[in-house]
């Protein structure tokens, strides 16, 4: 058997090993269902319980000694028996005595078995090394196996490896050896394997009222010091640190999450017992598996963890834990596995039994997720279902145990089968379908009974699959609630979210489950709405009300909690205590339906499907412009409360921030002076000026290029109030509607470069050989500069376009052009391409490292000024990175960009190849050059978009905390990189400035790497938040703009380029707006759809005479439809929309677009240029501008399949009308077969689409439909 077969199909009890890309051995565990516990988890829980029991004994002894000292006498026999340690063994009754081990705490090794047996060879769960996992993943990609992993044979081994399996302890009075024997003799997985350290740390003393073990959401401190209390991790986020001030836990005898909320809060000690008395696993909990009497017998389940809860029913802590004894918890079922002890993680990770990575929630199916391991594995780890995700949130650093892929996949299929049976759709949907992702390409042929029938409800055809047609004659129908969810997920972003296609043909390469949250950024905030009912209950109530029925959902009269629904779809529903809601919320909750609130997550018990949180603030009405922007900022963790008086110039004075005087520093002889050089300072938005350039010739073959950056480190001293506040904000946020600067306005004003005045700077000077533009010498020093002129990026762009600017001198213009020439040569060197110019650029990919400052509604819009300055900045940042790393070594703070995983890169290459482009992925430079060679700008942007979704963002890191082979910045193709050139908008630049000064002044001090890593992690988090906020704000403004532009017609008619084709949908890119959207077949008046996977062609079989512009699918008329929850405006027919747009273009009449242009002009933005095509050679007219913009090239006749012809005879014709749809439809590929009207959708062709903005939600949504070429003329 190959290693891959071992990994995916290992069914014996012999552990196997594989190695990672970095040569590290990893283990892969067996598990039959998500409810089972792996050997590793059971082992750790058992060890932890034993440690806690020993600690409890020590506590009892301390109490006894203390009492003896107080009484000055020995206690009576009865008192002595009460204070003495409990018997060694433990049972599972109401009062469980502590289990004592003869060995000390220090001898409790993680590899030791809980029953005293050997540490190695547990037969219930087996870990495979990473070498085999990697090989298995490789073979998995090549073999496309559809068979399931063989059934794991039943075994009844009784060796010491089985001792861990049962974890049953002998009756009272037995010795430790009996414990082992009892465990071995009752090795039954049907027993519950519970454990009590729900917060995964050693328990505090019983009198500690701030114990957060049981249900604490926040992870322990990421510092893996065994001697450090995990409680320190909670101290970072005081709002999530629970206390015991609410009293004892005697009132926890409740029924569910609604009525038990306060009881859970009353005593933190209760929280750690929350999973204490749990229900036994029910019959059939793992459907599809035969009863197992071997080491897998019955399955040790998460839902029955009672026997491992320390102090379960113990009398010593009855006052704090009594609510969880003998039914005090009312048998609440444990839904999630408690996290492993934080102190055990380092050893487990080093041994390869766990891997760490960052969790990314699948936005289309939020119960699933992926974990990126930062290059350890060549693909992300698939996390299947909420149970395996185990309460981890987006962006968490998690510890994951790898699992057998086939076992996880089989479990997922069983879950989907249950879901379909529940929905009574098993007869109509193949089991291989992924209802969460309709962007799939089904296998060419059905296999066995697994795929079921190929026909969907309402498909309107009895044809079966033939040849290369996948599900011929079917149209994938999404459930209504799923359609509504897709509208928000797809509509609330400019580009479609990345989706991994997984099915029987394309399985994940790795699978796993989260066993601990290693780190989480504290203080995360979420914007959303507040409701009295869960969303599903609210939808049911709305449906009953519309149908005139008596509601089956009753509003609770005195609810303990209300529900917070975050705007971010990746954040779970949050339970909020009712007393935190507005006072009249319960009685008048309807009036708050259109208001936005801000909340944070406080804790997530293992017995609750949802986390509990705190309501932070009431932002205001959803449709308020101020609320919309505040919501975006809060949702991305920018409270903007660091400088409360910043907007009041009367209050804030120059000296308010205790900045040092500048004048004395001008006399510092250690600073180089650049007083006579022609230095030009640049500003992107006019609010601050933090960089300047000069160039001069120093010989016939050499030039000097200087890059000067504002000396922020001189003004902001470490530990100062301003330093702390700027560290908290960490990054500026640039939105079209608002700018949130890193520093107060007065500080920006003082630090910024001023024209014809002395300014403090840090200068990087290159001596360049003009024959080959190689850097021959480099100088870095603190300096004093005098900029001769200040130039905006807008003026820079104007100069490079060949026009003159009145306020710019001819000398400055010449220097600006010289900078452009130098930048072009730098770019040629960096990308190893001597034929490159300064354009074209991959503008979207550039935003992977840094967000824009000068914004536009189209995220693809380029700026030559930005390109030139950025290219020179790359050279400077790379030089600073080398200098700091050479001087500080492991302490250097640098920036990297990781390579895409092999799986993602292969997916991208496959997609690009199907589009007809050859991609060379040898290096980053060859990859970018392959895309830059694409002449058609629209097609190039399509390919760029595909690559963008395969890439992750750049990350700050501490050199000593990162493997040396991952230092490089992949996208910039540079071995070392950092951020140095923008200190007024990035806190990380300030840190790098300080490090550089320490190197220059030879004042290097040893810094704690963990504290530096904490800074880089937080900077990464806030920088990602700033980028997300910018994207959301642009999307908001673009949606509002499209809504106003389409006020008359209700939608805009434009041309879209098909990027990807799937079995029942296709993606289009609309270049005028820079958006990518999905066209769903079930939103169109179609008879059926046929997908040819081999040719990548989707055929739409239209209903003749039905206009897709006004068509409403039947299910959208129900109360579940999202369209009933918003104010839906009037929509005209497609023909009327075309007439309106054409008339506007010809007459240049006053339209809503005029007011749109005025509004955007106030924000320094240009309105979108909507192109109205004319027939063939006629000129194109623009709605917004007089200048002409050409459309992407149309497909040639050779691109049309042989059996397809262009036929417009049955489509809408102009027939005397001046305005018609014919210009939009002239290049569509159609055919007529009898009574069937067919349109062919092929990748990279243009199709007319109707773009519509849905206004009225927390975030607006952009939706698209394709035009029906066979609609009747109206």
UniProtKB/Swiss-Prot annotation:
Residues 72-81, 139-152, 248-263, 438-453, 1190-1207 have a biased composition (Polar residues). Disruption phenotype: Decreases virulence in murine infection models. One of its GO terms (cellular component) is cytoplasmic stress granule. Residues 1-13, 95-106, 177-187, 264-282 have a biased composition (Low complexity). SMART domains: RNB (SM00955). GO terms for molecular function: 3'-5'-RNA exonuclease activity; mRNA 3'-UTR binding; mRNA 5'-UTR binding; mRNA regulatory element binding translation repressor activity. Residues 688-1001 form the RNB domain. InterPro entries: Dis3_CSD2, Dis3l2-like_C, NA-bd_OB-fold, RNase_II/R, RNR_Ribonuclease. Residues 19-32 have a biased composition (Basic residues). Keywords: Virulence. Residues 413-437, 1178-1189 have a biased composition (Basic and acidic residues). GO terms for biological process: intracellular mRNA localization; mRNA catabolic process; regulation of fungal-type cell wall organization; regulation of G1 to G0 transition; symbiont-mediated evasion of host immune response. This is Virulence protein SSD1. Plays a role in resistance to host antimicrobial peptides such as protamine, RP-1, or human beta-defensin-2; allowing colonization of human tissues. Required for resistance to membrane permeabilization and maintenance of mitochondrial membrane potential upon exposure to RP-1.
């Amino acid at each position: 058997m190959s290693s891959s077969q071992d990994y995916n199909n290992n069914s014996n009890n012999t552990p196997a090993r594989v190695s990672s890309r970095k040569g590290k051995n990893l283990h892969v565990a067996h598990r039959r269902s998500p409810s089972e516990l792996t050997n590793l988890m059971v082992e750790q829980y058992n060890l932890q319980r034993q440690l806690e029991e020993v600690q409890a004994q020590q506590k009892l002894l301390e109490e006894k000694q203390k009492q003896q000292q107080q009484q000055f006498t020995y206690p009576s026999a009865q008192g002595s028996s009460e204070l003495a340690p409990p018997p060694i063994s433990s049972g599972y009754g109401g009062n469980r005595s502590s289990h004592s081990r003869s060995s000390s705490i220090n001898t409790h090794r993680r590899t030791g078995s809980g029953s005293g047996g050997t540490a190695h060879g547990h037969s219930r769960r087996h870990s495979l090394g990473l070498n085999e996992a990697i090989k298995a993943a490789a073979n998995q990609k090549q073999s496309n196996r559809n068979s399931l992993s063989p059934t794991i044979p039943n075994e009844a081994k009784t060796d010491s490896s089985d001792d861990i399996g049962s974890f049953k302890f002998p009756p009272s009075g037995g010795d430790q050896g009996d414990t082992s024997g009892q465990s071995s003799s009752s090795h039954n997985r049907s027993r519950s394997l519970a454990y009590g350290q729900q917060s995964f740390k050693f328990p505090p003393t019983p009198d500690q009222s701030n114990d957060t073990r049981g249900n604490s959401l926040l992870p322990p401190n990421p510092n893996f010091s065994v001697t450090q209390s995990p409680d320190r991790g909670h101290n970072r986020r005081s709002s999530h640190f629970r206390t015991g001030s609410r009293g004892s836990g005697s009132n926890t005898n409740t029924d569910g999450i609604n009525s038990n909320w306060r009881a859970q809060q009353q005593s933190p000690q209760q929280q750690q017992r929350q999973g204490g008395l749990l229900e036994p696993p029910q019959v059939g909990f793992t459907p599809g598996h035969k009863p197992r009497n071997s080491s897998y017998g019955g399955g040790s389940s998460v839902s029955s963890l009672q026997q491992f809860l320390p102090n379960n029913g113990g009398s010593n802590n009855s006052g704090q834990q009594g609510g969880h004894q003998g039914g005090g918890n009312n048998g609440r079922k444990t839904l999630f596995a408690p996290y492993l002890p934080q102190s055990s993680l380092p050893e487990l990770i080093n041994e390869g039994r766990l891997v760490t990575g960052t969790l990314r929630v699948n936005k289309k199916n939020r119960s699933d997720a992926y974990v990126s391991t930062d290059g350890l594995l060549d693909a992300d780890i698939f996390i299947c279902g909420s149970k395996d995700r185990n309460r981890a949130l987006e962006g968490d650093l998690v510890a994951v145990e790898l699992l057998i892929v086939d076992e996880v996949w089989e479990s997922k299929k069983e879950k989907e089968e249950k879901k379909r049976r529940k929905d009574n759709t098993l007869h109509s949907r193949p089991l291989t379908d992924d209802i969460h992702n309709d962007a799939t390409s089904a296998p060419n042929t059905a296999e066995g009974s697994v795929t079921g029938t190929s026909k969907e409800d309402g498909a309107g055809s009895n044809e079966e699959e033939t040849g290369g047609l996948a599900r011929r004659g079917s149209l994938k129908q999404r459930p209504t609630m799923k359609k509504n969810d897709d509208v928000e997920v797809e509509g609330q972003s400019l580009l479609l979210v990345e989706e991994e296609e997984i099915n029987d043909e394309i399985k994940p390469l790795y699978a796993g489950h989260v066993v601990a949250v290693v780190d989480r950024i504290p203080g995360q905030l979420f914007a959303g709405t507040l409701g009295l009912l869960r969303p599903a209950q609210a939808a049911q109530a709305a449906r009953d009300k519309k149908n005139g029925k008596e509601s089956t959902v009753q509003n609770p009269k005195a609810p303990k909690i209300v529900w917070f629904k975050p705007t971010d779809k990746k954040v779970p529903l949050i339970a909020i205590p009712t007393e935190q809601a507005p006072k009249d919320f319960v009685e008048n909750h309807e009036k708050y339906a259109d208001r936005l609130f801000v909340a944070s997550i406080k804790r997530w018990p293992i017995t609750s499907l949802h986390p509990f949180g705190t309501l932070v603030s009431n932002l205001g009405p959803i449709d308020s412009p101020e609320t919309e922007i505040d919501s975006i900022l809060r949702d991305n963790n920018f409270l903007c409360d660091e400088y409360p008086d910043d907007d009041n110039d009367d209050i804030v004075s120059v000296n308010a921030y205790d900045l040092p005087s500048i004048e004395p520093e001008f006399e510092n002889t250690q600073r180089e002076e650049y007083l006579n050089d022609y230095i030009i300072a640049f500003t992107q938005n006019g609010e601050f000026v933090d960089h300047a350039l000069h160039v001069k010739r120093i010989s016939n073959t050499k030039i000097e290029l200087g890059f000067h950056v504002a000396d922020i480190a001189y003004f902001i001293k470490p530990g100062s109030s301003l330093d702390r506040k700027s560290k908290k904000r960490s990054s500026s946020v640039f939105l079209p509607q608002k700018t949130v600067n890193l520093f107060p306005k007065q500080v920006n004003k003082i630090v910024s470069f001023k024209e014809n005045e002395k300014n403090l700077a840090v200068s990087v000077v290159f001596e360049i050989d003009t024959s080959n533009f190689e850097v021959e010498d480099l100088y870095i020093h603190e300096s004093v500069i005098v900029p001769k002129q200040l130039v905006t990026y807008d003026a820079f762009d104007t100069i490079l376009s060949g026009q003159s600017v009145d306020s710019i001198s001819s000398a400055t213009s010449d220097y600006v052009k010289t900078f452009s020439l130098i930048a072009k040569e730098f770019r040629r060197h960096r990308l190893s391409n001597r034929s490159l110019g300064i354009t074209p650029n991959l503008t979207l990919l550039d935003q992977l490292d840094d967000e824009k400052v000068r914004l536009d509604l189209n995220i693809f819009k380029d700026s030559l000024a930005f390109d030139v300055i950025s290219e020179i900045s790359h050279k400077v940042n790379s030089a600073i990175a080398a200098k700091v790393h050479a001087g500080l070594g492991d302490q250097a703070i640098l920036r990297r960009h990781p390579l895409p995983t092999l799986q993602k890169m292969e997916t991208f290459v496959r997609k690009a190849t199907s589009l007809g482009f050859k991609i060379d992925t040898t290096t980053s430079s060859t990859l970018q050059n392959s895309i830059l060679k694409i002449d058609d700008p629209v097609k190039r942007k399509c390919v760029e978009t595909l690559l963008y979704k395969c890439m992750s963002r750049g990350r700050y890191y501490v050199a000593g905390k990162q493997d040396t082979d991952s230092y490089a910045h992949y996208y910039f193709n540079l071995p070392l990189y950092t951020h140095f050139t923008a200190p007024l908008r990035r806190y990380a630049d300030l840190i790098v400035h300080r490090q550089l000064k320490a190197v220059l002044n030879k004042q290097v001090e040893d810094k704690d790497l963990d504290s530096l890593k904490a800074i880089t992690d937080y900077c990464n988090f806030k920088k990602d938040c700033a980028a997300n906020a910018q994207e959301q704000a642009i999307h908001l403004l673009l949606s509002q703009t499209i809504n106003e532009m389409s006020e008359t017609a209700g939608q805009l008619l434009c041309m879209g380029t098909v990027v990807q084709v799937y079995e029942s949908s296709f993606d289009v890119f609309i270049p005028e707006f820079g958006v990518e959207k999905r066209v769903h077949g079930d939103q169109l008046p179609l008879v059926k759809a046929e997908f040819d996977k081999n040719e990548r062609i989707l055929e739409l079989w239209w209903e003749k005479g039905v206009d897709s512009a006004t068509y409403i699918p039947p299910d959208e008329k129900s109360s579940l439809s999202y369209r009933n929850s918003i104010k839906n405006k009037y929509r005209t027919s497609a023909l009327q929309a075309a007439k309106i747009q054409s008339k506007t273009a010809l007459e240049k009449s006053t339209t809503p677009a005029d007011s749109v242009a005025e509004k955007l002009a106030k924000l320094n933005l240009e309105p979108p240029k909507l192109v109205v095509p004319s027939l063939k050679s006629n000129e194109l007219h623009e709605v917004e501008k007089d200048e002409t913009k050409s459309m992407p090239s149309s497909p040639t006749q050779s691109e049309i399949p042989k059996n397809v012809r262009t036929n417009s005879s049955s489509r809408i014709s102009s027939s005397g009308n001046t305005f018609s749809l014919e210009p939009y439809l002239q290049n569509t590929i159609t055919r007529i077969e009898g009574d069937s009207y067919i349109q062919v959708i092929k990748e990279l062709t243009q199709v007319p689409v109707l773009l519509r903005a849905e206004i009225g939600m927390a975030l607006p949504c952009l939706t698209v439909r394709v035009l029906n070429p066979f609609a009747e003329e109206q």
